[in-house]
């Protein structure tokens, strides 16, 4: 994979290096930026060897120290902490208590010549026979399960120290905060088990801490901070209680910022988020309404809301994510021939200061893991991922949840309490600045096309931002391209009518050995052009002044903004497509009746496709495989996509029946990239000659429907320009001939069955079935007449006609009779006012639709048009009851 420079974001937090052997000096230089300004810092002095305190360390400390020394190797920051000792008494401050912390601190002090924390100060002002204190007390439990950091703060020792300064005017103790990180970032040679016990935000028990020291003690960081003079702090004249609280607050803030700088921000906030969700006013109102509706006690409704929130919430765990990254590295190396990433550097430039919402294409369950893995490996905090509740399987669900997934139900219609809890949870994530990832398509595409977006999560994100516009939101489209799908066979079953199998832990376990034996080719992840939410709001809500909107306010511009944003996301995903070898093979081979070509013809067709992409680039973020056509064919044979049949007149390359259906998936991935060239080629399928002006007129007519179906980025004028460019290129390649040279001149294809005619037909084949679908819809409407069919009835009749056409004649691609594609076409007809509903919601139309249907003769052959008209059904008419005579 290409190397990317890690950028610490979000919130500008420094990211840890990928290995524990990072440059110590660089780390030390970065950390002071994260420290709070202390109330009083003693002046630094030149380094010196500290005079030893009177007395020896306790015998138990010497014994345990000898036992621990072989397991500890310390990186001490800064390089010369001895400069903090000027002979005045020093008390070290730790983030939390623990025997291991005391021993590590003692070892660090001995190594740099500082006074031991285990020898008390003269007079023992702490009254604990030691010279260190801690803000928090570690759990006494021996459990392996960590507790959340940030519990009760113990300040007795600090209070005693401050009181001693009030009693003794000559006393001036320096507090030196010391941060200890055991196994902050163990390298990959340490193993995934060691990572489970590496440093994180959780307070852990003694046994877990012991394992952490044994496994990761050799990658321990000890960070000394500048000293704080208690005498100068007390000189501020604050009351004793306020002095104590201020000092504790400064120390807590210091430790938190150092911890964030070293191991990243605290994302393990499941309990906190759930509590915040349940305390929100909107959820409390929903709980009250639910209790009244169910005629139950408010506590019962609260328990139901709590169960919903707990079912939804992620439980991010840094150790689990690190362990998973090690495991996934081995998995990717075994099943993929590489994972390529493009344009991530552009995201890193745009993302600082923004909350990033990742909106990738969704074609495989691998999407969840791949994107989070790639971000983590490049120093970016993985996002919280929206996942379907069907993936909340035993064990697997827990691991996904600890990797940042939060689970939502497929349908929340009619469940106001669940909707309120989910909306509030998303609002808390947005307000907290967490990055989020969701799939606007709602589910995995079974056809390879981008599905029509569902705006539910986008609407929740917008409303959350409008409620608390703290940090600008950036939507990041991501295209994920595969050469072979793990779910290919199950998609094939679903497309042929078999119901989708429910996910189960046993099914997953059963599939693992089979998956690990396969070669799934290469994966490419392309980051598209980001979309700033504020730019969308500036267009749809120019009067919004940036002030928070009340939760119950629903502005009229919200729905159009959601629709525009969801369409723009899909368009930007398509603008970041990758064209891999299997995409190019699918475009070529599926254009032939038997899905087979001679090797020379296949090489020529692939070369033509690559030339079209190079001479008429779709966008600057589209990537194309650099392989030659010959290498593409070899690669397809290696991953068992292509079959070679030897023949004396030349080898024939083909795909089998099931593989051909699956190849249509990969053709559809990149269909939008060839829209203009396919359109021009389609017009010459059944026409020997055609005028340039006619091509442009028909192109403008059909473009709105193609744009809605394929999420194309151009205006009609820009699409017309691409048609002109395509014509010029086809003329240069000899695929078309200029009969006359004027602007509206006549173009012609070659006569007979030449190679040029064959290549032109192959280019046009990919859009042929789209135009057939359009004609089916028009034919069904015209056959039934205006005011007869509703939109839903028309969809069903179109689907039936397409299925029958596929059964009686040449088999079609699975999406040919996809009802959602007919629905999109009908919706666009309504937007263009070519059809409109009457008072009974029946579709009306006029002679313009007849004229539109007549234009089909330029694209579809006479026989095909006649066949479609024959299979187009009429609506069932109610039986007429004849009254008795």
From Swiss-Prot:
Pfam families: Acyltransferase (PF01553), GPAT_C (PF19277)
Topology within the bilayer: Peripheral membrane protein
The UniProt record lists the keyword ATP-binding: no
EC numbers for this chain: 2.3.1.15
Keywords noted in UniProt: Acyltransferase, Cell inner membrane, Cell membrane, Lipid biosynthesis, Lipid metabolism, Membrane, Phospholipid biosynthesis, Phospholipid metabolism, Transferase
Matches recorded under CDD domains: LPLAT_DHAPAT-like
GO molecular function annotations of the record: glycerol-3-phosphate O-acyltransferase activity
Main location: membrane
Organism domain of life: Bacteria
Subcellular location(s) of the protein: Cell inner membrane
Pro residues bias locations: 1-17
Enzyme class: transferase
GO BP annotations, alphabetical order: CDP-diacylglycerol biosynthetic process; fatty acid metabolic process
Similarity section: Belongs to the GPAT/DAPAT family.
Designated name of the protein: Glycerol-3-phosphate acyltransferase
Species assigned in the record: Xanthomonas axonopodis pv. citri (strain 306)
Lineage of the organism: Bacteria, Pseudomonadati, Pseudomonadota, Gammaproteobacteria, Lysobacterales
């Amino acid at each position: 994979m290409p190397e990317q420079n890690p950028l610490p974001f979000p919130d500008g937090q420094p990211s840890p290096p990928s290995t524990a052997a990072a440059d110590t000096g660089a780390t030390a230089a970065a950390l002071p930026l994260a420290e709070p300004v202390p109330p009083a810092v003693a002046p630094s002095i030149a380094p010196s060897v500290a005079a030893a305190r009177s007395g020896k360390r306790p015998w138990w400390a010497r014994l345990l120290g000898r036992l621990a020394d072989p397991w500890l190797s310390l990186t001490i920051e800064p390089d010369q902490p001895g400069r903090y000792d000027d002979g005045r008494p020093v008390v070290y401050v730790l983030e939390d208590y623990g025997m291991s912390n005391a021993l590590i601190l003692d070892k660090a002090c001995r190594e740099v010549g500082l006074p031991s924390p285990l020898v008390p100060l003269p007079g023992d002002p702490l009254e604990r026979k030691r010279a260190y204190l801690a803000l928090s007390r570690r759990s006494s439990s021996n459990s392996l399960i960590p507790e959340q950091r940030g519990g009760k703060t113990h300040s007795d020792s600090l209070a005693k120290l401050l009181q001693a300064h009030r009693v003794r005017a000559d006393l001036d103790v320096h507090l030196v905060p010391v941060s200890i990180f055991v196994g902050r970032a163990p390298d990959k040679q340490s193993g995934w088990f060691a990572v489970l016990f590496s440093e994180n935000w959780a307070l852990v028990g003694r046994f877990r801490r012991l394992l952490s020291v044994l496994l990761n003690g050799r990658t321990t960081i000890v960070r000394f901070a500048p000293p704080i003079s208690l005498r100068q702090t007390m000189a501020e004249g604050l009351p004793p209680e306020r002095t104590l609280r201020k000092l504790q607050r400064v120390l807590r803030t210091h430790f938190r910022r150092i911890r964030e700088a070293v191991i990243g921000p605290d994302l393990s906030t499941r309990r906190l988020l759930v509590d915040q969700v349940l305390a929100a006013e909107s959820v409390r109102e929903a709980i009250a309404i639910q209790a009244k509706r169910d005629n139950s006690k408010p506590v019962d409704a609260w328990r139901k809301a709590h169960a919903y929130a707990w079912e939804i919430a992620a439980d991010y765990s840094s150790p689990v994510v690190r362990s998973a990254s090690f495991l996934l590295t081995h998995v990717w190396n075994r099943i993929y021939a590489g994972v390529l990433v493009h344009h991530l550097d552009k995201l890193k430039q745009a993302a600082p200061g923004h909350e990033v919402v990742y909106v990738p294409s969704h074609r495989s369950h691998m999407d969840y893991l791949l994107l989070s893995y790639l971000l983590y490996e490049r120093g970016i905090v993985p996002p919280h991922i929206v996942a379907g509740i069907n993936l909340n399987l035993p064990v697997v669900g827990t691991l996904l949840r600890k990797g940042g997934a939060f689970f939502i139900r497929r349908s929340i219609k009619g469940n106001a309490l669940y909707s309120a809890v989910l909306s509030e949870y998303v609002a808390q994530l947005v307000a907290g600045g967490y990055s989020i990832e969701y799939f606007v398509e709602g589910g995995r595409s079974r056809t390879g096309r981008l599905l029509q977006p569902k705006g539910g999560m986008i609407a929740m994100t917008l409303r959350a931002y409008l409620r608390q516009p703290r940090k600008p939101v950036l939507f990041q489209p991501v295209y994920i391209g595969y050469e072979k799908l793990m779910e290919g066979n199950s998609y094939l079953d679903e497309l042929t009518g078999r119901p989708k199998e429910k996910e189960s832990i046993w099914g997953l376990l059963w599939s693992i050995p089979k998956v690990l034996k396969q070669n799934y080719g290469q994966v490419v992840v392309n980051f598209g052009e980001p979309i700033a939410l504020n730019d969308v709001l500036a267009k749809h809500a120019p009067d919004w002044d940036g002030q928070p909107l009340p939760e119950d306010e629903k502005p009229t511009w919200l729905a159009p903004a959601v629709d525009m944003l969801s369409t723009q996301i899909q368009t930007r995903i398509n603008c970041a497509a990758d064209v891999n070898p299997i995409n190019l093979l699918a475009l070529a081979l599926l254009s032939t009746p038997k899905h087979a070509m001679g090797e020379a013809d296949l090489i020529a067709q692939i070369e033509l496709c690559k030339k079209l992409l190079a001479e008429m680039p779709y966008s600057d973020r589209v990537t194309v495989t650099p392989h030659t056509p010959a290498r593409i064919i070899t690669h397809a044979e290696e991953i068992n996509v292509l079959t070679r049949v030897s023949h004396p007149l030349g080898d024939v390359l083909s795909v089998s029946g099931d593989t051909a259906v699956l190849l249509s998936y990969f053709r559809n991935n990149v269909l939008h990239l060839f829209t203009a060239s396919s359109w021009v080629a389609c017009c010459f399928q059944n026409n020997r000659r055609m005028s340039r002006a006619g091509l442009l007129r028909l192109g403008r007519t059909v473009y709105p429907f193609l744009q809605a179906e394929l999420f194309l980025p151009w205006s009609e004028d820009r699409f017309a320009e691409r048609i002109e460019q395509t014509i010029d290129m086809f003329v240069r390649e000899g695929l078309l001939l200029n009969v006359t040279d004027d602007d509206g001149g006549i173009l012609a294809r070659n006569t007979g069955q030449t190679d040029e005619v064959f290549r032109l037909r192959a280019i046009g084949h990919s859009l042929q079935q789209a135009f057939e679908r359009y004609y089916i819809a028009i034919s069904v409407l015209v056959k039934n007449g205006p005011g007869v069919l509703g939109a839903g009835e028309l969809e069903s009749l179109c689907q039936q006609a397409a299925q029958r056409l596929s059964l009686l004649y040449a088999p079609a691609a699975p999406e040919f009779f996809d009802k959602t594609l007919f629905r999109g076409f009908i919706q666009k007809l309504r937007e263009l006012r070519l059809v409109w509903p009457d008072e009974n919601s029946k579709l009306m139309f006029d002679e313009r639709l007849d004229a539109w249907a007549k234009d089909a003769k330029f694209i579809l052959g006479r026989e095909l048009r006649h066949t479609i008209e024959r299979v187009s059904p009429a609506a069932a008419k109610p039986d007429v009851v004849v009254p008795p005579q």
